[in-house]
Each structure stands twice: as structure tokens, then as C-alpha cells.
């Protein structure tokens, strides 16, 4: 069943959280993957309709992808691909990229595009273009921006903060995005933890204004070259 909420999320958030520690939950950020670093990701969804749901609400969905970063001072570039997996219909394969620079100390600005279908174009939906601004105030980082997509545009807001837990980074965050062509809202609360130098764990809960709560679990395998 392709519910309206699920359709809106798939369109709106196709590029927002497709998969790396460089974003929050349901929104992109101005962060980029570090230079010559690759993050290979596997993530699953549980519960209600969400942007990673490949079946009916209540059934889990599975995705796999990667992202990499290149630095061309003062511009930092990120690019990647991901795709839903399944025993039935898999795909489409999506491409996304963004470029970031720092306009002032502790500030970042990025423009990007996501959800560019390389396969199964007819059932993939339109790409999602966005601009994001971030500033680190010390007590927290604030994120704000706007994403454009046919019938799926959204203002995007987020807050995050990182602490040390057992000597490794532990991040708590929340974000807010619009759904249903700016007539609905979805809030998410999540956490990230650097389990090792090469493994980053992520999880978050989605709280839409309609439909049931859903959960996302993700593991990132990070290495440099």
C-alpha cells in the first residue's frame, strides 16, 4: 500500500537522510564526509510509514549505500549512491551530491541535490534540491534551510550537540521537516555513536503528524584511502 504520507516522505526526504553521518535524521545538513573518506551504510526501518519503507506500513524496509568526500579548498564536496534492497522489487539506485564552504568562523553553508534516479526513473520521483546553513554556538549547532521538489518542498530545521562518551563521540539531535507539500510536519529525535574508529551507529524515531511512529537503525562502516 502506497499511503499519502509514505509517498510524501519518499519524495521529500529522498536525499535528506540517505545515509551518512554528514546529515541529521530527516534533513540534510551543511556537513560533508571528510576528505578521501568513504562511509558504507546499511539501514532498516520499522513501524509506521517512513522515507525508507519499501513495503506496507508496519513492515521493515532495507537500504544500502555509500558516500565519500573530497576537499578542494575552500570547497568541500560530497557524493554518494544508495538503493532499497529486497527479495521483491529493489531499486531505484539514487545519486546525491553537495558542496560546502565556511562563510564565517563556526558557520557552514551547503547546496546539494539528492534523489537523482540512475535506474527505474519512471517510479523514482523527482530530485530534491536544497540549501542548508549551520552555525556552532558552542552549546549546540543549529541548522536551517530549504528544500525544493515538485509537490514536496520543505523548510528544514535541526539542532544537535556532541559529547564524549567513553572517549568517543556521542551525538543527540532533533529535526523538523514538512510533508504533504508543506501541509504536514514530521519531527525526529535521534542519536549517533562512534563505536570504533571505523563504525558509527545511528538510530532515530520519526513522529509524523499523521500515521504511526517509525524507527530507523543504521550502521556506517567508515574508512579512508
Tell where the protein language model's regions lie, with residue ranges:
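Short, flexible active-site loops
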Residues: 9, 113-115, 140-145
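Transmembrane beta-barrel domains of Gram-negative outer membranes and organellar outer membranes
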Residues: 19-129, 136-138, 162-171, 175-179, ...
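Membrane-proximal helix-loop-helix units in multi-pass membrane proteins
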Residues: 124, 128-150, 154
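Alpha-helical transmembrane segments in multipass membrane proteins, preferentially the mid-helix core
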Residues: 156-160
Amino acid at each position: 500500500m502506497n499511503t499519502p504520507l509514505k509517498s510524501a516522505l519518499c519524495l521529500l526526504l529522498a536525499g535528506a537522510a540517505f545515509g551518512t553521518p554528514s546529515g541529521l535524521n530527516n534533513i540534510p545538513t551543511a556537513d560533508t564526509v571528510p576528505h578521501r573518506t568513504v562511509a558504507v551504510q546499511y539501514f532498516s526501518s520499522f513501524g509506521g510509514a517512513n522515507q525508507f519503507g519499501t513495503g506496507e506500513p508496519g513492515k521493515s524496509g532495507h537500504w544500502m549505500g555509500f558516500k565519500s568526500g573530497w576537499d578542494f579548498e575552500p570547497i568541500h564536496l560530497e557524493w554518494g549512491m544508495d538503493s532499497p534492497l529486497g527479495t521483491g522489487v529493489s531499486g531505484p539506485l539514487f545519486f546525491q551530491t553537495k558542496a560546502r564552504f565556511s562563510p564565517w568562523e563556526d558557520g557552514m553553508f551547503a547546496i546539494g541535490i539528492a534523489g537523482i534516479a540512475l535506474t527505474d526513473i519512471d517510479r523514482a520521483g523527482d530530485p530534491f534540491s536544497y540549501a542548508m546553513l549551520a552555525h556552532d554556538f558552542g552549546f549546540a549547532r543549529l541548522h536551517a534551510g530549504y528544500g525544493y521538489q515538485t509537490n514536496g518542498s520543505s523548510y528544514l530545521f535541526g539542532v544537535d550537540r556532541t559529547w564524549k562518551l567513553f572517549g568517543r563521540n556521542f551525538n543527540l539531535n532533533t529535526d523538523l521537516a514538512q510533508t504533504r507539500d508543506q501541509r504536514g510536519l514530521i519531527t525526529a529525535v535521534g542519536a549517533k555513536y562512534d563505536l570504533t574508529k571505523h563504525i558509527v551507529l545511528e538510530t532515530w524515531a520519526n513522529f509524523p503528524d499523521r500515521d504511526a511512529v517509525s524507527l530507523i537503525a543504521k550502521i556506517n562502516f567508515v574508512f579512508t584511502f
